[in-house]
């Protein structure tokens, strides 16, 4: 209905009728007639709370704050969790459960994507594939805490590859071995990983680190996870021997 009235008001015949009937012309064009501007819904508006204006309002004198205390003072801010001095609920009960959000998790990479990159010729399966090769070929991006190989659907990996990553699932290791390949999981510290991915940033490469935590030592010495320390006979000698960090320094030409 409002649309019909607005069209009538904007029509030229309606303007001619106004001129012929003697009604004053208020402009070259007329705005559409609408009752929406006259609607009033007082429930959607809350009146301003006026305090300190006498006892009749109920908010005079202390303005609804009461007598003395932190609530009466200026700035009256109470820290979240404060319960007036009694033991807060955050301290009443022991901590339950745990969270793994703070752990440094490696980047997960599926074997299907590795096979796809080999089929495209972006990865060379004739040599050992390292995490630097995966980064340079854009097979995976943003390597911050290493790479973990995961198993996709069985049968996706058809090429025998030799790959070296930080971690791998048992299913991924089994699929690589079924395809006739080999895999080695190697421990990298943050410094060693940065030197491995970006060797041009180092004048002399850092010493290859050894796992320190008990969890990492158990992982990389376990042949079930293809750890690179699984074939080491004397782990203690590896950690405390004189040949702990054998490496050849690279000196750039001046």
UniProtKB/Swiss-Prot annotation:
Region (Disordered): 44-104
Subunit structure: Component of the mitochondrial large ribosomal subunit (mt-LSU). Mature yeast 74S mitochondrial ribosomes consist of a small (37S) and a large (54S) subunit. The 37S small subunit contains a 15S ribosomal RNA (15S mt-rRNA) and at least 32 different proteins. The 54S large subunit contains a 21S rRNA (21S mt-rRNA) and at least 45 different proteins.
Protein localization: Mitochondrion
HAMAP family with a match to the protein in the record: Ribosomal_uL15
UniProt cross-references to PANTHER family, sorted A to Z: 50S RIBOSOMAL PROTEIN L15, LARGE RIBOSOMAL SUBUNIT PROTEIN UL15M
Biological function: Component of the mitochondrial ribosome (mitoribosome), a dedicated translation machinery responsible for the synthesis of mitochondrial genome-encoded proteins, including at least some of the essential transmembrane subunits of the mitochondrial respiratory chain. The mitoribosomes are attached to the mitochondrial inner membrane and translation products are cotranslationally integrated into the membrane.
Pfam families named in the record: Ribosomal_L27A
GO MF assignments: structural constituent of ribosome
Span of the transit peptide along the chain: 1-78
Predominant localisation class: mitochondrion
A Gene Ontology BP annotation from the UniProt entry: mitochondrial translation
Ranges annotated as biased composition (Basic residues): 64-79
Keywords: Mitochondrion, Ribonucleoprotein, Ribosomal protein, Transit peptide
Organism: Schizosaccharomyces pombe (strain 972 / ATCC 24843)
Protein name: Large ribosomal subunit protein uL15m
Protein family (similarity comment): Belongs to the universal ribosomal protein uL15 family.
GO CC term (a single one): mitochondrial large ribosomal subunit
């Amino acid at each position: 209905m409002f649309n019909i009235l607005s069209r009538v008001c904007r029509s030229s015949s309606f303007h001619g009728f106004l001129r012929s009937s003697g009604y004053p012309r208020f402009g070259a064009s007329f705005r559409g007639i609408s009752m929406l501007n006259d609607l009033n819904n007082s429930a959607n508006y809350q009146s301003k709370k006026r305090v300190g204006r006498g006892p009749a309002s109920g908010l005079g004198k202390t303005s609804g704050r009461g007598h003395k205390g932190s609530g009466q003072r200026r700035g009256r801010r109470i820290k979240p969790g404060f319960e007036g001095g009694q033991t807060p609920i955050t301290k009443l009960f022991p901590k339950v459960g745990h969270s793994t959000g703070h752990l440094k998790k490696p980047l997960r990479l599926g074997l299907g994507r590795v096979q796809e990159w080999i089929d495209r010729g972006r990865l060379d399966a004739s040599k050992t594939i390292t995490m630097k090769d995966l980064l340079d070929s854009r097979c995976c991006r943003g390597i911050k805490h290493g790479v973990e190989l995961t198993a996709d659907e069985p049968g996706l990996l058809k090429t025998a590859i030799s790959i070296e990553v930080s971690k791998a699932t048992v299913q991924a290791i089994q699929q690589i071995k079924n395809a006739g390949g080999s895999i080695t999981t190697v421990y990298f510290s943050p410094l060693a990983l940065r030197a491995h991915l970006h060797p041009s940033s180092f004048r002399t490469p850092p010493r290859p680190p050894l796992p320190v935590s008990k969890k990492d030592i158990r992982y990389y010495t376990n042949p079930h996870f293809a750890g690179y320390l699984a074939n080491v006979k004397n782990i203690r000698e590896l950690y405390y021997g004189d040949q702990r960090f054998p490496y050849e320094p690279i000196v750039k030409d001046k």
